[in-house]
Amino acid sequence: MASTQKIRIRLKSYDHRLIDASAKQIVETAKRAGAQVKGPIPLPVKKEIYTVLISPHVNKDARDQYEMRTHKRIMDIIDPTDKTVDALMKLDLAAGVDVKIELQ
């Protein structure tokens, strides 16, 4: 059985518009270079809620809640060529997107 090589790209961001634009840019670049792309697959959103007392002494009922949502996407590039890897390395993505690349 022939083993195929693939690149797994994980994207994380607090802004869903930035992560979708970056994923679209990666997919277009990989397809233009001749690779097959699976994804972007949206992963569950991690929602962290912080509750803060806004009163310095009494009035425990006076609170504010803040939330932070972390959006995640994953995509696989199947059988990447050297041209594909070079094109992905030269790609300039938004500053608010965390990119992790694994070679499998």
From Swiss-Prot:
InterPro entries in alphabetical order: Ribosomal_uS10, Ribosomal_uS10_dom, Ribosomal_uS10_dom_sf
Record keyword Chloroplast present: no
GO CC annotation: ribonucleoprotein complex; ribosome
Keywords noted in UniProt: Ribonucleoprotein, Ribosomal protein
Listed GO biological process terms: translation
Biological role stated in the UniProt entry: Involved in the binding of tRNA to the ribosomes.
Assembly and binders: Part of the 30S ribosomal subunit.
PANTHER family associated with the record: 30S RIBOSOMAL PROTEIN S10 FAMILY MEMBER (PTHR11700)
HAMAP family: Ribosomal_uS10
Family: Belongs to the universal ribosomal protein uS10 family.
Name of the featured protein: Small ribosomal subunit protein uS10
